[in-house]
């Protein structure tokens, strides 16, 4: 059996860019939003998937 993990690469890249910008300007709220978007892009949490 093969485990399929669907990753939205476009959304992940956008969230990573947002995180870089947030870190550069020192905006922790923006960074947390980017972190949440990155988790969403990689379909976390995996342990709940069947």
From Swiss-Prot:
It comes from the Viruses. Gene kil kills the host upon prophage induction. This is Protein kil. It comes from Escherichia phage HK022 (Bacteriophage HK022).
